[in-house]
Amino acid sequence: MEMEKRFLEISQATNPNGRRRVKIVLHEIYPDNTRWNINGISYLEQYTRDNADTVKGMPLCAEFLDNDKEIPYGHGLTGQIKNMPVFEDSVQVGVFEDWSIEDIELEDGMHRCLCGVGYINEARYPKFVKWIEDKIADGITIRGSVEFVGTKENDGEIIYDGGWKEQGRIPMIYD
């Protein structure tokens, strides 16, 4: 099952500071490289733990359909500068402050996942928060993508255990 960016929790209460707490699945963690996500990536737990602190401070972004800023359309990718993806058509709607690794039960069984914990700035994007609440209330899974890149020390190249391959590649060193 494709797990990326599945909303696990959105707090019920509007906070006076305008920040609505969220917990979102960032990606599934696999036992080995015989299983992978839709992009062919097999995230293993040890490498996920080794790199998970990069979630802290990671922006939560959205590209919107129109100026109402209610319905997300994509992630706003417009190109690349060297090995850095550029997202000029998206805005930062929140931020992740922490992470956790959790076992999450879904209709097809248990899944081990890396989750991001943070907030959406409801004071700036109230229609977007309402859209999320409505989708969750209707039982609709919200999906998105997580962009990861290589580290500065590796000139922006992601280092894969066993090298790059189409399916079952294991990211080892990344941001």
Region spans (language model):
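Signature of dsDNA virion morphogenesis modules
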Residues: M1-D175
